[in-house]
């Protein structure tokens, strides 16, 4: 298994995995939209995508979004997406992607990686905790949906 940073030319091959990831979160299938979204993020250097590849097949990915902490005056990466295809979930790809994300963040001067997952997603929560992530009980997170104008 090889973990590497995605290039813009990988967007079409990552799109089916990204589409499955979105479907897990109850979004309608949109393969064309998935590819366009990924391509735009990569072209505009708005995210970093790390991919797990085995025998020429993409079996997983994680997507990191850069942001900053005003308090610490340091970079933070938001690990927004992590997905491994079902037939490869026992091969350690998720852990290897998390390790690669940690290495990438460290090499780029980040203070930390943050992420969120659904409360009921016990498998993901267990994986994150096995890889050193701790639930942040010191802060409350809010979300405001903004209507399009």
UniProtKB/Swiss-Prot annotation:
Q: What is its EC number?
A: 2.3.1.-
Superkingdom of origin organism: Bacteria
Q: Write down the SUPFAM superfamilies for this protein, in alphabetical order.
A: Acyl-CoA N-acyltransferases (Nat) (SSF55729)
Q: Which UniProt keywords apply?
A: Acyltransferase, Transferase
Per UniProt, the enzyme's principal EC class comes to transferase
For this protein, the record's CDD domains field holds: NAT_SF (cd04301)
The N-acetyltransferase domain extends over 1-149
Which Pfam families does UniProt cross-reference here?
A: Acetyltransf_1
Q: Which GO terms describe its molecular function?
A: acyltransferase activity, transferring groups other than amino-acyl groups
Keyword Cell membrane included in the entry's annotation: no
Q: Which InterPro entries match?
A: Acyl_CoA_acyltransferase (IPR016181), Bact_Acetyltransf (IPR050832), GNAT_dom (IPR000182)
Q: Identify the PANTHER family for this entry.
A: AMINOALKYLPHOSPHONATE N-ACETYLTRANSFERASE-RELATED, AMINOALKYLPHOSPHONATE N-ACETYLTRANSFERASE-RELATED-RELATED
Which family is it part of? Belongs to the acetyltransferase family.
Name of the protein in its database record:
Uncharacterized N-acetyltransferase YhfO
